[in-house]
A protein has these predicted regions:
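Hot-dog-fold acyl-thioester-processing enzymes
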Residues: 1-57, 115-134
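HotDog/MaoC-like acyl-thioester-processing domains
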Residues: 2-6, 10-12, 68-69, 80-134
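Residues located in well-ordered beta-strands
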Residues: 31, 57, 62, 76-78, ...
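A contiguous binding-surface segment within folded domains or other stable secondary-structure elements
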Residues: 42-81
Length: 134
């Protein structure tokens, strides 16, 4: 179990497919980064109630273990900070390796910063939205 949410409630959960592999036969890191961005955005929306964000930074990305075809990968997210216009989210990535002795392995983690925008992509304040405090 991780420190973000219960095992049954990741922001997203994906089974990795052969189309996502790199030249070494493991899942391409860029695919994982894309899902980290998606999971973080889901959390930003859930924690603030604001529906439109853009990613401005992906920080402290650390790849601990490779991800393999067939792994069921869970992306757990937690809001770290809600500012006037931005939200900082921590995403932890765990892979469930079927047919292995290991149940769930922490494979990656990252911190992502989003900025709230309007329909014209102008920065807007989050004030007045619901702020989930944990």
């Amino acid at each position: 179990m991780n420190e973000y949410v219960t095992r049954n409630n990741p922001a997203i959960r994906i089974t990795m497919m052969p189309r996502d592999t790199n030249a070494h036969g493991t899942i391409f890191g860029g695919v994982i980064l894309s899902y980290i961005d998606t999971a973080g955005a889901v959390e930003a929306i859930r924690s603030t109630g604001h529906e439109r964000f853009v990613t401005i930074a992906l920080r402290e990305v650390v790849f601990h273990e490779p991800v393999f075809v067939g792994d069921m990968v869970s992306f757990y997210a937690k809001t770290l900070k809600v500012g006037n216009t931005s939200v900082t989210v921590r995403v932890a990535v765990e892979a469930e390796r079927f047919g292995s002795h290991e149940k769930e392995v922490r494979v990656t983690e990252a911190e992502v910063i989003y900025v709230a925008v309007d329909e014209q992509r102008n920065k807007v304040k989050i004030a007045g939205e619901k702020h989930k405090k944990e």
